[in-house]
């Protein structure tokens, strides 16, 4: 089985997972002029941009664990100073013989307050609670946290961006679960866009 196609096994999981997921795709784009074939890639470097080195490592490990063709960038660039040195960065990537780089970064974070209306128990009769003994659950205000993450894929053969997508995650409880949701939804969207294809 070839390279990126090994990721397609995750799509069955994501299809089952999507109904209860707090992550959704906002938009995506595929380069219509690219001639590189992601289905034949053998090595893809995963680079998560984060001010926290610990969060970067946790996130990259979570994504890299999904396929043997994915590799965490911190294992190649443990020192951030190397990433800031373009020449050293290019040399490291060439030595590793990578086909592509997939980057992930937080591009927006916001909070929204909404009102959740109250409800009556007992159906129709609940509205006449004083007489029929129904029960009223009062409404309340709820604050939700939204995180938008941008994922970009760069072809090293063509030296350009070939796919990008943005996801929105609501009220993530744990970083590893959130990044797993983002990755699954992202791979699923790649298939929808025709960027990667099912094994024939």
Spell out what each predicted region is.
Residues 5-10:
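Sec-dependent signal peptide recognition
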Residues 1-3:
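Short, Lys/Arg-enriched N-terminal segments with co-localized hydrophobic residues
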Residues 86-153, 157:
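Surface-exposed short loop/turn segments
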Residues 63-68, 120-125, 170-173, 183-186:
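Short, low-complexity, polar/charged sequence segments that are solvent-exposed and flexible
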Residues 21-41, 51, 138-200:
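C-terminal/domain-edge helix-coil "capping" segments
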Residues 42-111:
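N-terminal segment of the mature soluble domain
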């Amino acid at each position: 089985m070839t390279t990126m196609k090994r990721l397609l096994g995750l799509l069955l999981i994501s299809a089952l997972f999507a109904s209860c997921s707090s992550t959704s795709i906002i938009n995506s784009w595929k380069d219509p002029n690219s001639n590189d074939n992601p289905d034949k890639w053998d090595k893809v470097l995963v680079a998560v941009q984060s001010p926290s080195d610990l969060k970067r490592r946790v996130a990259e490990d979570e994504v890299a664990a999904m396929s043997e063709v994915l590799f965490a960038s911190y294992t190649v660039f443990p020192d951030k100073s190397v990433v800031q040195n373009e020449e050293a960065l290019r040399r490291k990537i060439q030595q590793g013989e990578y086909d592509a780089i997939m980057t992930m970064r937080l591009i927006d974070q916001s909070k929204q307050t909404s009102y959740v209306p109250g409800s009556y128990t007992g159906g129709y009769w609940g509205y006449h609670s004083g007489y029929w003994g129904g029960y009223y659950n009062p409404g309340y205000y709820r604050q939700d946290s939204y995180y938008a993450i941008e994922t970009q894929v760069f072809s090293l053969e063509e030296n350009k961006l070939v796919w990008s997508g943005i996801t929105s995650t609501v009220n993530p409880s744990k970083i590893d679960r959130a990044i797993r949701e983002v990755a699954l939804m992202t791979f699923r969207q790649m298939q929808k866009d025709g960027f990667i294809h099912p094994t024939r």
